[in-house]
Structure formats: structure tokens, C-alpha cells
From Swiss-Prot:
The keyword Ligase does not apply. Residues 1-24 form the signal peptide. Disulfide bonds join 41-76, 47-68, 54-74, 58-75. Its main location: secreted. GO terms for biological process: defense response to fungus; killing of cells of another organism. Belongs to the DEFL family. It is found in: Secreted. GO terms for cellular component: extracellular region. It comes from the Eukaryota. This is Defensin-like protein 109. Keywords: Antimicrobial, Disulfide bond, Fungicide, Plant defense, Secreted, Signal.
Length: 79
């Protein structure tokens, strides 16, 4: 009787460990390759005021450069 309780406890812990490892898996974020720059686009508000406002916005975010794209989104480039 005691042996089956131990097996049941080990089985329960194995299931709990399996479930926790599935739920706690870190999200995959691609790392830019050497020389490749990461670009992140934001809303249109800075670009409505001109390219300089987009550059100022991106500088305040701590990025290297900012440009308005064809959709008038302010895109910041990370180095």
C-alpha cells in the first residue's frame, strides 16, 4: 500500500513539473545578426509634425535614428 502512494506522488510531481515547464518557457525573440539593425515602428503622431519630431521621439527612446515610413509611422532604429 505504501509503495503505490509513493508511485502516485512521483507521478503527480512529474505531471506538475511537465506542466510548469510548458507554461514557463521563455518567449523567443530573434536577435539581430552582426551588422543588422532592429527597427521598431510607433504611431503617426511624431511624423505628423515632421521628420525632426520623429528623430527627437526616437532619441528620447534611446535609439540611434528615426524615420517616417510610407504609412507615416515613426520608425526607430536600434543598433
Amino acid at each position: 500500500m505504501d509503495f503505490t502512494k509513493k508511485i502516485l506522488v512521483v507521478f503527480a510531481f512529474t505531471i506538475m513539473l511537465g506542466i510548469s515547464s510548458v507554461h514557463c518557457r521563455p518567449s523567443f525573440k530573434p536577435i539581430p545578426l552582426f551588422g543588422e539593425k532592429l527597427t521598431q515602428c510607433f504611431d503617426t503622431r511624431p511624423c505628423l509634425q515632421g521628420m525632426l519630431k520623429c528623430i527627437e521621439f526616437c532619441s528620447s527612446m534611446g535609439t540611434a535614428d528615426g524615420q517616417c515610413n510610407n504609412e507615416n509611422l515613426c520608425c526607430c532604429t536600434h543598433e
